[in-house]
Amino acid sequence: MKSYVFSLKDLDKTQLAVAGGKGANLGELSKIEGIQVPEGFCITTDAYVRAVESSDEFNVLVGEMSTLSAGELAKVNEMSGKIRGLIESLPIPAEIEEEITAFLEKFGEQNAYAVRSSATEEDLPTASFAGQQDTYLNIIGRDEILKHVSKCWASLFTDRAVIYRMQNQFDHRKVSLSVVIQKMVFPQASGILFTADPITMNRKITSIDASFGLGEALVSGLVNADNYKVRDGRIMDKKVSPKKLAIYALKEGGTQEKKVAAENQNRQALTDQQILELEKTGRRIEAHFGRPQDIEWCLYDHQFFIVQSRPITTLYPVPDKKDGKNHVYMSFSHQQMMTDAMKPLGLSFFQLGFQDKPEKKSEGDLFLPIGGRLYFDLAHDLSSSMGRKIVLASMGKIDPLVLNMLKSLAKRKDFLKSLSRSGKGFFSMGTGYFSWGLVVQSIKISRDNDASIVPTLMSQNEASVRELQHRMESLSGEELFAAVIRELKRMKEAVCDPKSMGAVYAGTLASSWINKNMEKWLGEKNAAGSLSKSAANNVTSEMGLELLDVADVVRQSPAVMEYLGHAKDQTFFEDLEGLEGGDAVSKSIQAYLEKYGMRCPGEIDITRPRFSEQPTALVPSILSNIKNFEPGAHNTRAEQGQLETKRKEQDLLNRLEQLPGGKQKAKKVREKISVLRNFIGYREYPKYLMVRYYWIIKQALLREADKLVQKGVIREKEDIYYLSFEELREAVRANRVDYGIITERKAEYEAYAKLTPPRVMTSEGEALSGEYDTGNIPKGALAGIPASSGTVEGRARVVLKIEDAHMEDGDILVTTFTDPSWTPVFVSIKSLVAEVGGMMTHGSVIAREYGLPAVVGVENATKLIKDGQRIRVNGTEAYVEILSQE
């Protein structure tokens, strides 16, 4: 005979499908020596299925629910209410009722019990569904307990549970629910313990929230809780809150709010000794589960009882370093304006391209993959006084928030003493990744100011790309993978060539010099931005302007314009050929893709779909260009930019000449402007070169993926994205792969994609915080980094994906980050606000090139600014004001 009810002691963490997350975890907790768990039993998920499976009405309603989306709140509310009502009205099958009754007799039918929901998708390692279903406390009597079992089953369809499943792509028909019934504990105090600080994410700090009575008062937000921080067995901080209310159990069943006696309201809920004892309990539980835990506890008769433990799913991962030293990890992804999670092949491929000896099969350690993003370790740089000075000076020009974080860290003497000194520094001149040769080249190039250097460098690299294309076309198997290693070495040499990087730095140093001295002499901030418009040899700004030419071809064909509104990538060019004017449009777009088709959002990740793979991503920008610009706008905008730059240059020179020593100042500024104009555009080229290498190699790897699909090694060619480069190499060699790894990596990637990567974190897991200096900005304004000067007002368009960027003339783009692929969108907008970026990141450079006021590094901009609101962007003083709430 099938059993529907089990004692908690008979369950463990492997029985998620039977007992749900809460039941499985409680069963596992009961097996840890020294951990007290209230006695109880679990009604399995099979019991829920048995109770609802015979109801045709239930199946119909759940089917209808599955057709709704999370945004249809009224319909979700109505449908979920019907399902709950139906479940509560269904009789509990007799065999299940008998088993429940038997367990109640065993534990004492007249005892008070807590009746808790335990869903199968609850408290997973990668997602926490805490609070999505219901809990009922102090339930007494068999009939009441049975009634509340049905209520728990019904709570699988609360509005919040349904919407959460919709948002996280869980199927309503594939989730089920068990019910945990435990003897009530009537606590003097209760609360929540986090074995890692939920605010800073520091794994060394335990954070305890505590209040009087039952924990439901705390969880529901009814009362303020005490908070205690413990590190290494020492209480490091205590915040004792006034606790005016508490929830207590009633003898006859149910609960009641009570006022706390005045003399006890400001008393610690736990003594210091109890705090330290509870911290040890938390660490024991964490050690058992092998990861940080969110633990619900209660104190009764001087003894701690644990009523739940679940993984903390919001913590950002930390590298597992075994050296016993401190490390400091700075996000490279933020500097690249690409904070989305990357897939394993993308991470390992990028690492491989920038390690010292890519011919070795070990993948590089300059860039560390953490939580699906790229970080580099600053420990070596920060371990010395000189190194800290170099890092802080460098970050002052890149990201003020990171600068403030590192300044704060530099004050922690004990932390600095234990920093790792192994490996290379990232910023350390001569010993790290910045060479004296680069300094010499940039000085020489600035002094000579030879405008022919950049076209010569570009011509040489174009030839190398053509040769690469030819070499890769005929390669396959191990021969291909060996060639990829060689080509990545060539790519690194080309991208990091001292002469090439010297040209980049010549432009950026000229920009810094102009900004510094124009503010000093004329009180004008960020003047270089106004002098960078229509600069020569800027492949990224040209990418945006050349899409205007494509729009001019498209606008001549109404049939094509209509088709673009519903175009599909798979048949894009085939469909165009069948339309009037489609042949000309097809040739125009294909010519554009020949130059720029290797670009895409997040292009440093080789796995991301390129414009050549997903041409419809360009459609919104093409249609916006047709709507917002007259024919021939490319040349008009380029000429206008050059004219505005000339006017700005002359204005500055005229004003300088009025100053003491003005003629000499004006002469020097004229020279620096010439250097700026000759070299600032080239700053975009090295990355363009890199992604061209990426695209050629990606096409070769996808040819290998097609072969693996044909042989049945993988199911779809995109599966290779979830293998590292070396794993893919081995799969091709052996014609074999453990598909379980791919499945596991896909789940891991989805979990990483939901995390917010910190700009800077320590090896203890602490996410450092930093703030802008907001002293000179209007009250309530959002602070950021000045990326491009000027002040404008307009309608905010909050856009998270380039394919959703349907912009109108005068709109202000508000987004998380922009990389070069977003440049076509910049043509139509009035201004830019981005959550991520710095003065010299791509979005900032192109904003200056196009003359768009821009503020970047505005934290949570896409959440604080609503789509359609009218906002003011001050790119000079680096703030954004929300002017209307509509």
Residue positions per predicted region:
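Conserved divalent-metal-coordinating catalytic cores
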Residues: M1-I35, E39, I43-T45, V52, ...
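Extended, domain-scale alpha-helical bundle/helix-rich regions
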Residues: D123, K672-R759
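Core structural elements
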Residues: K106-F107, N111-A127, Y300, F304-V307, ...
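Glycine-rich beta-alpha junction loops
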Residues: S117-E121, G131, V185, A210-L214, ...
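N-terminal beta-alpha lobe that positions the nucleotide/phosphoryl donor
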Residues: M1-V180, A189, Q265-Q273, L278-A287, ...
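Accessory helical subdomains and C-terminal extensions of nucleic-acid helicases
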Residues: L104-Y113, T645-G661, K665-V669
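Amphipathic alpha-helical segments within well-ordered protein domains
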Residues: R84, Q133, L656-E657, A705-D706
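Short, compositionally biased low-complexity segments
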Residues: V52-S80, A119-F129, I235-V260, G641-D651, ...
